[in-house]
């Protein structure tokens, strides 16, 4: 029994050491940062298996200036590239949005834009929600962004007052608490390209993309993504659609087009962007006269 306890203690310490090692690797990685007005773009290529014993490519938008910029949700009834939705709305930045039906194109989780309900959570999606796999809702007004813990009551979002809402899954962090993630789901445990949104305690909004399915970018499990969101200082964090949908777009000084490595074409380049149903945009606010 004493030997067994010692082994368990050793394994626990080893896991903790590895977690500390990953957090240090993340913080001390070769991050490149560029500030444009109130928007910051960060990117990092982790090589030689330096993060989670794997190669990773991560990109982050940080939005802290709500005087000049605002978050905006976009939707098209026919699948459209995130970059094209961004261009149509003259967005300066964008990532892909929430989940959708690949064949019939419609959102499979609640979506409201400019007060109009455009998508309802399907019965199939509703069955997935549990105490260990909570849904979350990104709520957007002109001056504020919130991440809400979705109630299990069907179509709960429809009664909320926010003009723009996008439900996604799962909720990773809420009010500073790392939420449990259902361990028997491949979607949780397997590594994929990931897209997520987070909010820090000071109101800074983060849009995060993790590339995957390539030797230089392994992708992350949701538990790994959850750790990354915590290391980025998120008080609240929500996973969005990922895989081949994952896209990071820019139209700012010296940075134009898709900057990550979408995987739908099977190559590690910028040309594999998938058409999607919806997206999260960053737009410039109209100047007040």
Predicted regions and their residues:
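Structural recognition of the beta-strand scaffold that forms the well-ordered cores
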Residues: 92-96, 137-139, 146-147, 198, ...
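Sec-dependent N-terminal signal peptides
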Residues: 4-13
């Amino acid at each position: 029994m004493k030997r067994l306890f010692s082994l368990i203690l050793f394994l626990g310490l080893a896991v903790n050491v590895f977690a500390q090692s990953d957090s240090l690797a993340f913080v001390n990685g070769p991050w490149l940062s560029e500030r444009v007005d109130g928007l910051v773009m960060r990117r990092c290529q982790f090589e030689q298996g330096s993060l989670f014993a794997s190669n990773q490519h991560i990109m982050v938008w940080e939005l802290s200036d709500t005087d000049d910029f605002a978050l905006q949700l976009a939707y098209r009834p026919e699948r459209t590239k995130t970059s094209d939705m961004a261009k149509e709305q003259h967005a300066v930045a964008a990532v892909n949005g929430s989940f959708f039906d690949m064949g019939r194109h419609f959102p499979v989780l609640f979506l409201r834009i400019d007060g109009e309900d455009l998508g309802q959570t399907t019965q199939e999606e509703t069955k997935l929600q549990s105490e260990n796999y909570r849904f979350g809702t990104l709520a957007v007004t002109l001056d504020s962004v919130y991440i809400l813990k979705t109630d299990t009551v069907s179509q709960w979002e429809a009664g909320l007052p926010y003009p723009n809402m996008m439900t996604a899954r799962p909720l990773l962090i809420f009010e500073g608490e790392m939420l449990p993630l259902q361990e028997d789901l491949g979607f949780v445990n397997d590594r994929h390209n990931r897209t997520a949104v987070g909010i820090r305690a000071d109101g800074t909004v983060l849009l995060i993309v993790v590339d995957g399915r390539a030797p230089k970018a392994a992708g992350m499990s949701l538990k790994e993504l959850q750790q990354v969101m915590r290391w980025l200082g998120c008080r609240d964090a929500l996973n969005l659609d990922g895989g081949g949908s994952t896209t990071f777009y820019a139209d700012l000084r010296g940075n134009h087009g898709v900057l990550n490595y979408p995987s739908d074409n099977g190559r590690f380049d910028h040309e594999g962007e998938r058409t999607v149903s919806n997206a999260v945009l960053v737009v410039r606010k109209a100047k007040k006269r």
